């Protein structure tokens, strides 16, 4: 048996060795740094490929924490590698090596760099302590396809240089300081940009998006430390925009205006922290509809984060999206004394909600309080009226005993459902606000909010696994 396995491995090695060097080099370049280096042990022919294949140089916290001497290896790798460098990811303690970064970025080995990520290990609440982005980072503008900058001050020089990024497809700016003019200039120089993520940046009060290629935009605001932060986001002209992702329900901005986004399919998380939301000519103020005149037929996924089970607010949004397929409701914590107890909304068949007739197939309720009648009525409303509903997933924010779910089952089981095929799944878990969503750039995901449950830590501790209950 052992001899057969050894022969099989040898045959596989022979087959791979028949491939042209260019193909083998491409294979090596797709591997992580450690795995790529290990290919030298496969055969003699593979050994020179590692030094000539496109390099993915990833220096992360794990490596730096083991020994500071690894930092000294970076210039050695860059000087000795004979091939181009495709990716340079540096996650570092900025105080230890900031003065060296400029030299690394000036290396000829990085001349055709496609992906650059600079992420300081530490980020200070005081934005005055942020280091300026190394000027050498700007020299890659002609070739970069992916750029991620975290915890830097981006000087106005970026705007004055009118840099062009003809190949840039993904851009992430997180906890950076940058002026409005510099950011607008940077974005106007990205004719191929498909995804943009802006997280907790300072210096931008108003951002106007006008892009013919942008498909996904993720954003959130952090106002805890003062300064100028994003207060108004305007989608002026984005014909290809499919996703508008507010990554934190409490992370603003105060005003969002969607003027032209004819392909918008995924929107969320919406919350009352957004003081004013314009969807064409439809206006919401703190989740309350002021006017309902525009309908968006392209919208298929909506994520809403209300304070308590406010059916009126949710229904007003549903009226805007007649073809909605999936609804996620992430309840925010609220004192039980002011829950919407009288929230048993009556459905008027003469004025039906369009998405209830043919399209709404999935409803997910997170942080659900099954002991409160307002939450029970909230779930009942969809069971009684959504004719196309296939599944409803309900997650409690805490560990619950069997009796808790048995009580909910008894209240929901006997309902006369509009859709006889609707399945209800109950589980306990951890309070979840979906702030873990990190899929702004993953355009392959059909629904970036369709993620596995975190699970209940107490159930795992008791050896119960991820227990679910069906209704």
Spans of features found by a protein language model:
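C-terminal per-repeat helix/turn "cap" of leucine-rich repeat
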Residues: 45, 137, 161-164, 183-186, ...
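CRL adaptor-proximal regions
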Residues: 1-18, 454-471
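Conserved positional slot within leucine-rich repeat
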Residues: 56-58, 89, 117, 148, ...
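C-terminal interaction modules of eukaryotic adaptor/scaffold proteins
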Residues: 386-427, 433
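Conserved hydrophobic position(s) of the canonical leucine-rich repeat
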Residues: 85, 113-116, 144-147, 168-173, ...
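Leucine-rich repeat
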Residues: 2-210, ...
